[in-house]
Amino acid sequence: MNDSQSWSTDDVSVEGFERFIIEYSDMVGREMGGYYYTEIGGTDIKYINSGMGKNNTRTMSYPGPGIFRVRADLYGRVAPHTNWHTHPTNA
């Protein structure tokens, strides 16, 4: 992930994702959750996985399918760094 938005490479910053998912969570009135991933042995966040939100409530989120179900090519290359979730302001 880059530190700033890069429209030419479709890279999104962690901060940009966080702003988006917090605003989205507030808009739909549901907690959202998922994981940040790093390359194995690394510390920089390279991938973000977000749950679908289908069965989420204002105070509970489900991380959804693991990143390897949607990106099998990452298996053995990345590891979970942090579990994250939002708190909607209207909760």
Show which residues each predicted segment covers.
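Conserved residues at the C-terminal ends of beta-strands
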Residues: 86
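Conserved beta-strand-loop surface patch within small alpha/beta domains used
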Residues: 1-80, 89-91
